[in-house]
Amino acid sequence: MKILDKLFNRKKDLPPEKETKPPTEFKPQPQIILEDKKFIENSLLFDGEWYCKTYGFGKYLDAANHYLKIGWREGKDPSPFFSTADYLKKNPDVAGGDMNPLLHFEKFGFKENRYRAEIEQVLPKILERHPECKTEMHNGLLRIRITNACNAKCRYCGVRCTFGEEKNHAMNPAWYYELCRPIYDKIGVVLITGGDAFFAKESYNYMKFMSENFPQITLMTESNGIAFNEKFQQLALKNLFKTHFSINASTPEIFAKSCWDSDDSATAKKMFPIMIRNIKNYLAKLEAEDKLCFAPDLSMVINKDNADDILDFVELALKLHAGFIVFFFDYTENDMSGEFFTNPAVARPAMKTLMELERVLAEKIIIYCRLWVPSGEAYDLQQEVESIPIAQLNSKYEKILKLAEGRCVLDEWKKRNEFRRKAGKIEFSLVDDIAPTLHLKQETDREICFAPWNEIDLYPDGRMDFCCWFEPTLNLKNFIEHDAAGKEFVDWDKVLNSFEYAFARYRILRDDFRGCQVCCPMNSVKSPVESITKYNVDRFRS
């Protein structure tokens, strides 16, 4: 099993054209299980109210259970948008397998592009019935991988480890220069990522193009810093980039041991000083223009080979005036679909240290460490950390506190927004500034993951969806049309209000995160920085 398969059942090679798949192999389902019922209840093609009214049942009938067990056998439809008889007629393998047709569609048919034309035909009526599943993007996020290629050899890189030949693919420049152009007016952040943001041939040209033509947009970059040379530094300085560098260690030796492929440690030891030098050069430019509030975020992936480097890494990050300090746990050493760390001897003490630092530094600089954390780990450790007197923690981390003197999360955030306002850029809330890709939107009486409503994630081969941690179900190639002059264009409203997007919204509104990465903090429908608010950062929202 490939590494990312542990997180979700990702299919890398979605066909650009819609094809009929071979018959599904499945066994008859003699008993109804709760999971099957959930598939029906949370289907955009099921309407319990319509079902009861149409077939004369009382309002107290468990409509999903009835259709799942009995109704489909009687030829009943789950809604006006899905025909039981028609689906079985067009899919004889399903008819012969004694499986509920809507359940089959949910589990198999959707991914196999079955019943596609029929759904597209009724999609306007579906969206009319469920307006909460329709959207018009506003200050959205476009995550764009202009290349999957990278100049590093990180041993835990998902692209390197699982993308096969696609790991070197670059996106057709016409896609981000022309096809994406109509959506830019609805975008607040363009996140340039993939392989390395600064490594593609078109990286500089694209960043310059965006800065000149869409100055209201904040460009966010994810990189190791190796290719972040003078021309990129000047461009980032002038246009207030939000930069993130994965440096992963405090020294070249630890970097080579814990991050880089072990068969090329000599190269790793040469690359690390280049990364640090580029960051320092950029910091000098920022400081000269009183823009240190835009200092890069720095991150580290924690594993067995660098867990004892956390404090030294934090010290280095503070010396480099890091905007935020971000930690991830190496998913190749843990089952991130489980509730607890696979390597607790290494990961658990590391997590406790991060929680202590999070508490000590909360108002000075944010330690962001709650991403890719098995769901059962944080609670007990949090209680331990809460029970420690703050004076004891301040004494324990006296050296780190000294390095953080004068830092203030609130002041730096306000200053960034002052610069953005003067430059005509969209301003950020504090939470959005910390985690532009992981935040919540208000939905009636609660908050919920913003991504299905306001994000597009685009890969070099055209695969796309609303989040890089959601199984891609669309392909840009299927949305390319031609105008009267033969010029290609994309109607982005059709993308954003496609059945796939609407379907995901409907499920997520019902706390059904099927297809999402199992350990995403959004699955709990809580802010990824909620824990920090315990330490008085909540007042920063005012």
Functional labels for PLM-detected ranges:
Residues 11, 17-125:
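Charge-rich, low-complexity intrinsically disordered regions
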Residues 51, 87, 176, 255, ...:
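Hydrophobic/aromatic residues in well-formed alpha-helices
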Residues 119-242, 253-270, 277, 333-358, ...:
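Conserved alpha-helical substructure of the radical SAM core
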Residues 1-41, 114-133, 406, 412, ...:
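Membrane-proximal basic amphipathic "stem/tether" segments
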Residues 122-138, 160, 164, 443-457, ...:
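Flexible mid-to-C-terminal extensions adjoining Fe-S/redox cofactors in radical SAM and related proteins
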Residues 99, 144, 148-151, 443, ...:
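Processing junctions and N-termini across compartments
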Residues 145, 166-169, 238-490, 529-532:
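Radical SAM enzyme [4Fe-4S]-AdoMet core and its adjacent flexible, acidic
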